[in-house]
Amino acid sequence: SSFDMIMAGAKSEMPGSIDKAPRHDEATGWSSTAISYQRGEADPPHHHVEGQLLFATRGVMLVQTESDRWVIPPQRALWLPPLHIHSYHLLSQTDLRAIYFSSSLIAECTSFTKSQQVHVITATPLVKELIAGLFSEDYARPSQRKIALLLLEILSEAPPLTMALPMPNDERLFSAAR
């Protein structure tokens, strides 16, 4: 498919693991980044060694994987499993929060049966506050680790929303949909 060709090109053009996630130490098991994007900016196909939770405090993004796309406004958060290739395009000025969870931290949350599935959840007030807590300097790292684990627990319990827009298999339609 066209996506496979894009992915093959991305893999050959990007160095190493093409993982841009900030590094974390295994003791904490998570890391985070906050980035502000202008409308129209994009991040080409890439993946991360960690699981990733994407959330926009402001703005809207379009996230694409090989088989689906998701429009993610501030009322939603998107879970991407470790090593899942994805790209995104910013549909408006967007303040993005990305939290990366190590495989070992994900494994500690034994109830997270959807950890290998891309899915969208509602960003409830609690989810938003937990995300904010991971970006706050008001909490020590051990407390933030507990916040990260609680966020994974909530991800495991939250019903996935059916927001995926399937990508067409026909090459011409796929090109038009991109």
Model-based region annotation:
Residues D19, R97-S103, K128, P166-R178:
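Short, surface-exposed, charge-dense and proline/glycine-enriched linear segments
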Residues S111-A132, D138:
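Aromatic/histidine-rich interaction motifs
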Residues Q116-Q117, S136-R178:
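Short, Lys/Arg-enriched, Trp-marked, Pro/Gly-tolerant hinge/linker segments that flank
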Residues S1-T28, G133-D138:
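A short, N-terminal "cap"/entry segment at the start of jelly-roll beta-barrel domains
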Residues H47, I121-T124, D170:
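Short, solvent-exposed loop/helix junctions and linker helices
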Residues D4, C109-K114, T162-M163:
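Short, charged, solvent-exposed linker or helix-capping segments at domain edges/interfaces
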Residues K20-H119:
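N-terminal regulatory/effector-sensing and dimerization cores
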Residues S1-F3, W79, R178:
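Short intrinsically disordered, low-complexity coil segments enriched in acidic
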